[in-house]
Amino acid sequence: MDIHIIYEHVERELYNAFLIKFELEKRGYDVFISKPHEARIPSFNAPKLIIMPWLFGEHNLVDLRVGYIRRFKKILNLQYEQVMSQMWLDVGYHISSDKARNACQLCWGNKRKRILMDAGISEDKLVVIGDIRQDFSKPAFKNFFKTRNHLSNEFNLPEEHEWCLFISSFSFATPSESSRQYIDETIGIENSKKWNEISIKSQKLILEWIEQFVRENPNQEFIYRPHPSELKDTNYLHLQKLDEKYANFHFIFKYSVQDWILNCDYINSWISTSIVECYVLKKVCNILRPVKVDEYFDIPFYINADHISDYESFKERNLSKKNNKFPIAHNEIKEYYDDIGEEEFIYKKICDYIEVVINEDSFNEDYYNHGPIIDNLKFLIGKLFEGMLLENSLRHSTFCRVCSSACSTFVHTENS
């Protein structure tokens, strides 16, 4: 194995991982994909490069060390969260610490690069390439995603009706006890409490708007697409009940957000950065703000955007396409996504950089505090007691096979 790609959320990252995998395999590399923390027997040989979706600090390195008998020397952090509020920046969230700071860091734009440099990360570890997710919004991928007809048949969505989409991001509204404790420790109890209150009130009012809308407009289909983290929260049951109560309300978490953005007539967001995909696809997206979000907690390019704060405006924007102006100014988005709108594929530029990192010794780093054998003995003893030395489940995942097939077909036929 030359390269080990680790992903967290299936819907957000797996297509990206397979796209990189098959491009690298075309170039002659052996690539393996897995989720973090998947129980497996440590491999004897370490890969030439480990690619991470995030890299916070020492605890991530500990998880990586127990996977290999021999030392790994190179890590690339894809940084799947790069646009965040000042609150998260102030606590250094998603900024690598300890020895993780020595990893290569992929930046979507120069704004993120400056933030990391200000945090003390060396410029020679930073590369500005762009967000790979933007590739899927380019014309070459027009046949990559599910068609409206496919979604209509699978989810009983009348094709002749107009479809409204809400891209939810209420992962902080009803966190688990362990998540709440982690948030309290990370951003402080006062900030945690205030952000939780804003999230709960906003979600409650937006759901009231949506329920009133589907009740008043039975020929409009409304799709609630949750954030992956919301599938674990207590509001899950409430959304399921709404799905059962109204024939035109659909609580659907299957498929990527791009599948839904492409096929819906009206799109709504609260604070999701997926609004950037709407921008690239030239789809107008409404920003719903029944409760004011303090600038300290808000996504930077949402602050000066056009917001909807009352039900009547929400209703009008989901029944009429008269307003076709995007709510966020181009320059606000461009500050964080340097390559937005460019025709060149970002995944190919990422693979070009990966080859540079693999082939240059200057990117070698020591990520160990102890020897790898000691770390792996601890791992094996712990897992034997837990009974967790299980077969890697990735190879048996239906969705993984679908992603793999789609990406393989695209990479091997593109430009052929």
Where are these regions (language model features)?
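Active-site and donor-binding regions of nucleotide-sugar-utilizing enzymes
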Residues: 4-141, 145, 230-231, 275
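Donor nucleotide-activated moiety binding/catalytic core segment of transferases
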Residues: 36, 225-276, 280-281
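Conserved catalytic-core segment of nucleotide-activated headgroup transferases in glycan assembly
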Residues: 142-238
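Short active-site oxyanion
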Residues: 100-105, 221, 264-266
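Short, conserved active-site loop motifs that form the nucleotide-linked donor/cofactor pocket
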Residues: 103, 126, 247-250, 305
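Catalytic binding pocket for nucleotide-activated donors in carbohydrate/polymer assembly enzymes
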Residues: 239-240, 273-341
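A generic structural motif
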Residues: 1, 27-32, 217-222
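C-terminal amphipathic helix plus adjacent low-complexity
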Residues: 317-416
